[in-house]
Amino acid sequence: MNSKSREFIVSQDWLGVNKIFFNQKTGQYSENVGDLIDYSNFEFDSEGLLTYLDFGYCAFGKTPIKGISFLEQNQTLYFDEDGQLEIVNNDDPSINYIETISSEENTWEQIESNIRSFCDKNINKNLCVPTSGGFDSRLINFFSPRKEQIKAFSYGLSSNPEKSFEVIKAKNICEKLNIDWNIVEIGHFNKFITQWIEDFNISSHAHGMYHYEFYTKIKEQNNIMPLISGIIGDLWAGSTSVSEISSPKDMINLGLTRGINFDRKFCLLNKKIDSYEKEFEEKKDLLKNSRYRIISLIRTKIMLLSYLIKVPINLGFECSSPFLDFNICMSMLTIEPSRWENRKWQRDFFMKNNLDLSHLNKKSSYRNDLDFNSMILHPLDPLNVNLLSPIFKESYIEWINKNIVSSRLDLRVLHWLMNTKYLRSIFPKLGINDKSLVAYNSYVVLKPLEEILKRVKQVEKK
């Protein structure tokens, strides 16, 4: 077809931080899928819904809503000469890099230059650096040219935040670098669930509310300031790998769900739908390359992970990250494999620059009580059984509602045991899990669906 006969609508870039959802008939598009939903003519898409349940967020161009899709990376949406929508796959620039080897020295120079440039651009302002003590925020703080410009903020995961490993490491780093460091206490973030669904709708599960509380408190106490994020730096740097993908069912390996999804066996729809056949066939040869699998993992999960900068942006912060820059990302990914694996190249850099914190591991708490305690501090409204039971097993919805009440003594004891040093690895092998957190993870996947169904019912009553 002659390209001149096409009418350009919108195009997605190489990474997809800014989502592009679109109506399959009209071509109307928006970053918020909620803008496109017709509640008076609503129908779930079975394949898209099952994909959402499996991943905990939308994946592979599908959404749970019939007639609404999203553009994947390097795709352009057109009207063809007959006025029909057409998706065109553009060249993928990352493919040119997956067989190359980059220079560590050059990679460090690129990261430093990016951070310095943003700091210089905001030379007369304080800069917010969310600091976990992990590698990415550690590098941002280290490469910031004027330490007095930085205000670092951390939160802890355990019931005693000041003993959390993130907080101890962040405080130590900031003391070494003479950076103003602050701890932000969070825990009431479930009150932001309505705001989350308003901003992200059905694009992902409702599990990022803690960032709304975190940045809201920073904003209230310090006003808005430019922010440098370490978003996805760990994935480019070698923190994880993706096992081989040899069949459609292996495509779930690109999800990195960390348990925040919903078991499709509790869904009443046809669960035998093979949601991933098309995606596997299109990319199976490229997915033989371990680096391309990392790229695909990041591109898949960016549907969710983009909230790491979208939440502060929604609250008024100007955000930047070196780890969203194409050249930096490709340089990090293509470090010599033996140096890239487990981030050895970064570990050696920290040793060389007196930023190694491994000696603090035994002095820190690795408990994660954040979600559990949030259900006590701000109890969740039970899921609407009547609304959800036509799609999901009623008994399981009732089980979720029962076990999100984490103030129950039996659930508190179980959670404490599950986080005890010697039991946390034994219990899962015995089939024992932290019931309240399993319920919480299922809840946050279903809650955006419930909100859509509520709006459908409201429209029906009019």
Show where each model-derived region lies:
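Cysteine-centered catalytic environments shared across enzyme families
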Residues: 1-185, 199
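Short catalytic/ligand-binding loop motif for oxyanion handling, primarily in non-cytosolic enzymes
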Residues: 17-21, 97-98, 136-139, 190-193, ...
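Short hydrophobic alpha-helical segments that form membrane-spanning helices or hydrophobic packing faces
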Residues: 21-25, 140-142, 237, 329-334, ...
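Adenosyl-5′-phosphate
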Residues: 68, 253-462
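Generic recognition of stable, solvent-exposed alpha-helical segments in well-folded globular domains
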Residues: 72, 106, 110, 135, ...
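Glycine- and acidic
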Residues: 95-102, 152-157, 196-200, 310-316, ...
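Conserved adenosine/adenylate-binding substructure
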Residues: 124-127, 190-241, 272-319
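ATP-dependent adenylate-handling ligase core
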Residues: 158-218, 231-255, 285-286, 333-337
